[in-house]
From Swiss-Prot:
Keyword field contains Transcription: yes
Name this protein carries in UniProt: DNA-directed RNA polymerase subunit beta''
Cofactor or coenzyme needed: Zn(2+)
Presence of the UniProt keyword Transcription in the record: yes
Lineage: Eukaryota, Sar, Stramenopiles, Ochrophyta, Bacillariophyta
Organism listed in the record: Phaeodactylum tricornutum (strain CCAP 1055/1)
Keywords: Chloroplast, DNA-directed RNA polymerase, Metal-binding, Nucleotidyltransferase, Plastid, Transcription, Transferase, Zinc
Comment on bound cofactor: Binds 1 Zn(2+) ion per subunit.
Family: Belongs to the RNA polymerase beta' chain family. RpoC2 subfamily.
Transmembrane intervals: none
Cellular compartments per GO CC: chloroplast; DNA-directed RNA polymerase complex; mitochondrion
Record GO biological process: DNA-templated transcription
Length: 1415
């Protein structure tokens, strides 16, 4: 064994692995296998000789366990107390408990290890777990530590841990909880196997046609691996990554600059030793991502074949290798974590502890931000790295300086004294997975809400709110209820607290319909009065006319009525406006449709002719309106209208023909009247035929006569006498003008018959309900009624009139009275309790009682019963509070809600103070009565809401704006036109006038402009705002002219009215802010809350940004805001929502997150998880668009997340980078006043570079998931797959190419097409890069056979057939399906020698072959 260093150390699993790897590299696989066999026998031999066994005695429990549990319990009790005092929220308490337990569990594990290491190093459990033979730490922890926190079926962590371990045995509760986790483990294993199999299938389908096809693709691109000075640890990682790759640029000695290694060398372990020696830190490497080949990779870009550590062979199916390598660990990942059965593990935090006692001081340069952690502590977070100093107690000791990194949580305040070994800081864990939920906080008791005013910190938009609920009993009653007592009053059991009378409207006798015990469902009918109809008959019609089914004959007048049969009784149905019956009459019937005219002004004749109507008393004016119908004339012009759809040639009459009555217009359609035919056409079809009756005269001079009315006896044109009132109308016929004389029919509006003569009220005289008749117009004036049916112009109806409002519960019953030959009309009213209760009390606990009996006759306004609320037990009342909003709310504070405490316990407390007793938590509340030695407390419970939006602050200080974007008017951009820009800035009451400045735009390319504007900065409350102002506006000036606030007119600038074309203005409304001067703002209850900012822009018509105010200093550390829904001194019921708290939950980091996460990255899912109802902050998932400094002067790089530790959407990343590379930006010169446009790089390079960024992002994301699980996958495999995901682009503009918009095509393909098109001098196509997930990429395979055998077979085949695609059978899958030899490995096609000349082949062969060939 040459060059093997003798190892005199413990050889565990890791060292064994290294040993075998060494032998594999230096010798070959056969030798390595032999060595492994030898090692196996060695192990068995010594294991059997040592006689290692495991018994229950080997499981030793550390003796500190009980102490630790006690300590943890104490911490939890403290957390409960703090919660009850209102210092932390419910959510934070939960978090505190979980943190306490997970910390206890971790430290117990440390204890176990410590114990084994120091006292019992040969313990068989210890040997087993730590040699890597079987089992791991978490399992040993469960055997001898504590089982720890479990997650419930939905994956949430339960806040009660299992404190026992398996050595001690579990209690019943523990066993059940443990069962949750175990079941989860079993189910997950099954699911994960399936998932991981499917992942492998998709991966192989994507990569199946990627082979090694060439020796070298001659690419100029390379991957750069470099190491900065700080990260020397990661140097070994990088050496691992570059092992077996090929260098693309030569490596120079950093000191002498001579070439150490030429380009194109394979990196071997020996070379890596050389790099370490010369301290090389930059490597330019070839990688599958840089390979130029299309759907293939060359030998040099791929590097070693990992199975034999040599350069890969040509024809190797590396795509399939890659798919298998990525998918296979998936199954392992699943199995790996679940031996423990769903245990919650949290990574140990990196903490900073103090070495000595002393006072802590922060450096001035250390910038910190206040943050409330999810455990409810206010801590400082460092925004930059710096240091703190400890000043020790002893003067002999030196000062201790502790370096602090960025994003460290610091627990102590400045100048705080600290004992040795205290945790003063811990690093924020940025890569943990967190989901934010919203938890509603419900009230435990009913009572009143009190919000004490907390001290405000200046300039904070979010502040903390404390909410007290002081207990009391809440009763809701109607507003007009009567309250039964005064304060300090004793109430007996079942006495009422308030009571409201229920009073009836109509007199009548009582009848119960159903006798339900629940009063709200009980129906009571009160029979009211009767009417009798004399000489009348009721007959049923065979079929209903106008939905009416009975005929009521009332002394010769026939009425149509609608009647419903129910329980053999006839009930009269009334319509919405209480119309009961309609009179049948033919006097106002017309033959056909037409136009009706009457003077509708005349209908309302209430006010005096000369009275002036006062504008302000408009309301009364409406109330005085009572429609009084004056009796007058209706004028009717008949006109027959047919709606038809037919061709012209079917028509039997032409436009302008005069026809007789009964003429056939189209086959089967006859006219009812004679007259002139008018035809309207639509799309060459006949739409309507109308026939206007009358006489027709042809001729020329009608101007004088048209549109006039003539009376009988007059003569037109000195020879045409008129016999009936007529209206002359001028129509255009076929070819000549015609005058149509249309007869006018006149109907007189009738007077009413009094109906009360025919009806006798038999029951009681002062009846509330009357029947009366009424005449109404059926149609509005000047309305053309199309049609040929008979119309009733006027209808006479019977209506039911009631003095009271409640008419929806009326029943009208008709019955024949046999003796008197009359028809009786009985009116009864249903009485339902629900109609008396206002809706907001509907579901509150109101009780009720009735005071009436069946068949009792009651008068009007009798008390029917009470709505009331009773007490369930006797009370002694201490205080009452009343509040009247939409209902009367009564809060009783009785003895049960109060506590009496001795005064000497709480010294210095006065009336209305709040008390929290730290020893006895029950003594918490507000003092409401005090005397010599006792205090009476009203019990209460505080609720704490941190980081609420402060409602008061926002209106006063924060600048709010709203941009209103108009419809965009874009004028034609012609060259060298002087555009005018004017910026008008006017408040509600003032106006700014400004200089106009002209600008000529010199721009050669007809390119769509996206202009950038210079910014106007506004500073307010320490926040900066920018407002976009058009360029060249450094010259503008604002003139403001102020008016007195009482001057109400808004003056509009005159200039604006004239220049309307091409103007695009945006209006900006700001809530009154200090920036705009607004005199109205200070007036009380002024309506002018909004100031107006108006920008008018001229040349920048395509500007995509709306001009407005933008906040520059976005607070990146802003937390999600919590909301509180109740207001001070409200009364609240039990179980109402007080507010919402946001809580962050850490998700257990096992492969439950792993596989789906890998799938999500490889499928390039667009994550839109915004649920609408959760008020999340808008900054979720935003990426930085420009590299810039933020408020804390931190550099934020392009394409990084604004909020830290968040998943990036790869599609957005691609877009951000492509915009950055490919966007056309204007460059504006102020002196010459001209604009030029340029972009960073061309379309192809922009796409290529942004793809490279996304590729490295996806690679890192997937590797991060696998590495967190301890699975090592070589980057090559992932790179092969990622290369397949990032080849396509989406065409956005086709140019002169034969492509279509939104077509998806390969990047190299479109580049080739564009080169050809440009060489011919034509317009090339534009495109944007497109990222496809693995499923999409597999379906977009150029071979349709491969795609169809993967998914969506019919769709793929149909599409291929329509497009007429050809499958060239390049990949493996197509060939297998067709039945050919697969083109990989030995079957890979070797076309090298096919095209060479014969003579060349012959010259290379040896002579002896030659002779064979010639024979």
């Amino acid at each position: 064994m040459k060059n093997y260093k003798y190892q005199n150390t413990l050889i565990g699993k890791k060292q064994l692995r290294q040993l075998l790897a060494w032998s594999f590299t230096n010798y070959d696989s056969m030798q390595a296998c032999a060595l492994a066999d030898e090692l196996k026998y060695l192990g068995f031999k010594y294991a059997s000789q040592a006689g290692i066994s495991i018994s229950i005695e080997d499981l030793k429990i550390p003796f500190v366990k009980n102490l630790m549990l006690e300590k943890a319990n104490q911490e939890i009790i403290n957390a409960e107390k703090i919660y009850l005092k209102g210092k932390i929220t419910d959510v934070e308490r939960f978090q505190k408990i979980i943190d306490t337990w997970s910390l206890t569990s971790e430290s117990l594990k440390e204890q176990v290890i410590y114990y084994f290491k120091n006292y019992d190093p040969l313990n068989s459990v210890y040997i087993m777990a730590f040699s890597g033979a079987r089992g791991n730490l978490s399992q040993v922890r469960q055997l001898v530590g504590m089982r720890g926190l479990m997650s419930d079926p939905s994956g949430e962590i339960m806040n009660l841990p299992i404190k026992k371990n398996f050595r001690e045995g579990l209690t019943i509760t523990d066993y059940l909880m443990s069962g949750y986790g175990a079941r989860k483990g079993i189910v997950d294993t099954a699911l994960k196997t399936a998932n991981s199999g499917y992942l492998t299938r998709r991966l192989i389908d994507v990569g199946q046609d990627v082979l090694i096809r060439e020796k070298d693709c001659l690419t100029n691109h390379s991957f750069l691996f470099s190491v900065s000075n700080e990260e020397l640890k990661s140097l070994n990682l990088i050496y691992q990554k570059i092992l077996g790759r090929v260098l693309s640029k030569p490596i120079h000695d950093p000191k002498t600059n001579r070439i150490l290694v030429p380009a194109g060398t394979q990196i071997t372990p020996k070379l890596i030793e050389k790099f370490k020696e010369y301290n090389v830190k930059k490597f330019y490497i070839r990688s599958p991502l840089t390979c130029n080949l299309y759907r293939a990779i060359c030998q040099n870009c791929y590097g070693w074949d990992l199975a034999n550590e040599n350069l890969v062979d040509i024809g190797e199916a590396i795509g399939i290798l890659a798919g298998q390598s990525i998918g296979e660990p998936g199954t392992q990942l699943t199995m790996r974590t679940f031996h423990t059965g769903g245990i919650f593990t949290s990574e140990a935090r990196q903490q900073i502890t103090t070495p000595i006692n002393g006072v802590i001081r922060f450096y001035k340069t250390l910038k910190t931000v206040l943050l409330r952690t999810n455990r409810g502590e206010d801590v400082l977070i460092t925004k930059n790295s710096g240091s703190v100093i400890l000043i020790p107690d002893d003067e002999d000791q030196d000062l201790v300086q502790i370096e602090i990194l960025r994003n460290t949580i610091l627990f102590p305040k400045n100048n705080q004294y600290i004992v040795k070994d205290t945790v003063i800081g811990e690093l924020l864990n940025t890569n943990r997975q967190i989901k934010t939920e919203v938890k509603p906080i419900l009230s435990d008791t009913c009572g009143e809400i009190f919000m004490p005013v907390l001290k405000k910190k200046i300039n904070l938009l979010n502040n903390n709110k404390l909410l007290w609920i002081l207990s009391g009993q809440l009763y809701n009653g109607p507003i007009n209820s009567f309250v039964n007592f005064y304060s300090d009053y004793k109430l007996n059991c079942r006495s009422y607290i308030f009571r409201t009378k229920i009073i009836n409207h109509y007199s009548g006798s009582v009848e119960f319909i159903n006798t339900k015990s629940n009063l709200y469902q009980r129906l009571i009918r009160i029979k009211n009065n009767k009417y009798a109809f004399f000489n009348s008959k009721l007959e049923k019609l065979r079929y209903s006319i106008q939905h009416k089914n009975y005929l009521l004959n009332l002394q010769g007048d026939k009425y149509l009525v609608k009647i419903q049969k129910k329980d053999l009784r006839l009930y009269l149905q009334a319509t919405r406006n209480y119309q009961v019956a309609t009179l049948i009459t033919n006097r106002f019937k017309t033959l056909v449709g037409g136009t009706v005219y009457y003077d509708h002004q005349n209908v309302y004749k209430n006010y005096k002719p000369n009275s002036t109507i006062n504008y302000l008393s408009r309301v009364n004016f409406l109330n005085n309106y009572k429609p009084v119908v004056s009796h007058k004339t209706i004028i009717w012009l008949g006109e027959e209208v047919y709606k038809v759809n037919c061709e012209l040639n079917i028509l039997l009459a032409e436009h302008g023909d005069f026809i007789s009555e009964g003429f056939e217009l189209i086959p089967g359609l006859f006219s009812k009247t004679s007259g002139v035919v008018v035809i309207k056409q639509k799309n060459n079809l006949i739409h309507t035929i109308s026939i206007k009756s009358g006489l027709v005269y042809e001729g020329k001079k009608f101007k004088m006569t048209s549109k006039k009315v003539y009376y009988p006896g007059e003569i037109i044109f000195s020879h045409i006498p008129i016999t009936k009132i007529s209206f002359c109308e001028h129509i255009t016929g076929k070819n000549i003008e015609q005058l149509l004389v249309r007869p006018i029919e006149i109907y007189e509006f009738p007077y009413l018959n009094n109906i009360s003569a025919k009806i006798q009220n038999t029951h009681n005289k002062d009846s509330n309900i009357r029947l009366s008749s009424k005449i109404i117009y059926s149609y509005k004036p000047n309305q053309l009624i199309k049609g040929t049916r008979n119309l009733n112009l006027i209808s006479t109806i019977l209506t039911l009139k009631s003095k009271e409002t409640v008419t929806k519960n009326l029943n009208l019953e008709l019955s024949h009275n046999q003796k008197t030959k009359l028809i009786d009309l009985k009116i009864s009213e249903k009485f339902n309790l629900n109609h008396y209760i206002s809706p907001n009390l509907r579901y509150k606990n109101l009780q009720s009682c009735l005071l009436i009996q069946p068949n009792q006759f009651i008068d009007r306004y009798t008390n029917l019963g009470y709505l009331e609320s009773k007490t369930s037990n006797s009370l002694e009342i201490v205080k009452i509070k009343l509040k009247i909003k939409d209902s009367k709310q009564i809060l009783l504070i009785s003895n049960q809600d109060c506590l009496t405490v001795k005064k000497e316990k709480f010294i210095g407390k006065k009336l209305n103070d709040f008390i929290i007793n730290s020893s006895n938590v029950n003594e918490t509340g507000k003092i409401i009565i005090e005397n010599e030695n006792n205090l009476t407390l009203q019990k209460g419970k505080p609720y704490f809401f941190p980081n609420c939006k402060d409602d008061n602050v926002i209106n006063k200080t924060n600048l709010q704006y709203k941009t209103i974007s108009p419809t965009r008017v874009s004028p034609r951009l012609e060259k060298n036109i002087n555009y005018k820009i004017s910026l008008n800035y006017y408040d509600m009451m003032k106006l700014s006038v400004n200089k106009d400045c002209t600008l000529s735009e010199k721009n050669e390319d007809p390119i769509k402009i996206k202009s950038e504007f210079s910014k106007l900065f506004l500073k307010k409350n320490g926040k900066l705002y920018s407002s976009l102002i058009p360029q060249f506006f450094k010259k503008f000036s604002l003139h403001t002219s102020e008016f007195s606030p009482k001057y109400k007119q808004i003056i509009q600038p005159n200039g604006l009215a004239k220049r309307t074309i091409g103007k695009m203005d945006r209006t900006l409304l700001m809530q009154s802010s200090e920036i705009t001067k607004n005199d109205y703002k200070n007036l009380k209850n002024s309506n002018y809350q909004l100031a107006l900012l108006k920008f008018v822009e001229y040349p920048f018509t395509k500007s995509t940004k709306s001009i407005g105010l933008y906040s520059i200093t976005e607070d990146y550390f802003e937390q999600d805001v919590n909301s509180v829904f109740c207001k001070n001194s409200e009364f609240i019921e039990e179980g109402e929502t007080l507010g919402l708290l946001n809580l962050e939950k850490e998700i257990t980091g096992d492969i439950v997150q792993g596989l789906p996460r890998i799938e999500e990255i490889l499928e390039a899912r667009k994550k839109n998880s915004n649920i609408k109802r959760i008020p999340t902050s808008q900054k979720k998932g935003l990426l930085v668009q420009k590299s810039s400094l933020d408020t804390n002067f931190e550099f934020r790089k392009l394409g990084t997340n604004i909020k830290e530790n968040e998943k990036v959407n790869p599609h957005k990343l691609l877009k951000v980078y492509f915009n950055y590379y490919g966007w056309i930006k204007p460059f504006i010169c102020d002196q010459k006043e001209e604009i030029k446009y340029a972009r960073l790089i061309k379309n192809y390079e922009g796409s290529y570079k942004s793809f490279k960024k996304v590729q490295s992002f996806i690679l890192d994301s997937v590797q991060a998931v696998y590495q967190s699980q301890g699975v090592i996958i070589n980057d090559k495999h992932l790179e092969v797959i990622i290369k397949q995901m990032t080849t396509k682009v989406l065409i956005t503009y086709e140019g002169n190419t034969p492509l279509l918009r939104r077509e998806v095509i390969d990047l190299y393909h479109i580049q080739y097409i564009n080169q050809i098109i440009q060489s011919q001098g034509k317009q090339s196509a534009c495109y944007v890069p497109l990222l496809l997930g693995i499923t999409k990429a597999a379906l977009n395979n150029p071979s349709f056979i491969s795609a169809a055998s993967f998914q969506e077979t019919t769709r793929v085949l149909t599409k291929a057939a329509i497009e007429g695609r050809i499958d060239w059978l390049r990949g493996l899958k197509e060939n297998i399906i067709i039945g050919h030899l697969i083109p990989a490995g030995t079957g890979s096609q070797n076309y090298r020698n096919c095209f060479k000349k014969e003579s060349l082949v012959r010259s290379k062969l040896p002579k002896s072959f030659d002779t064979i060939l010639t024979r």
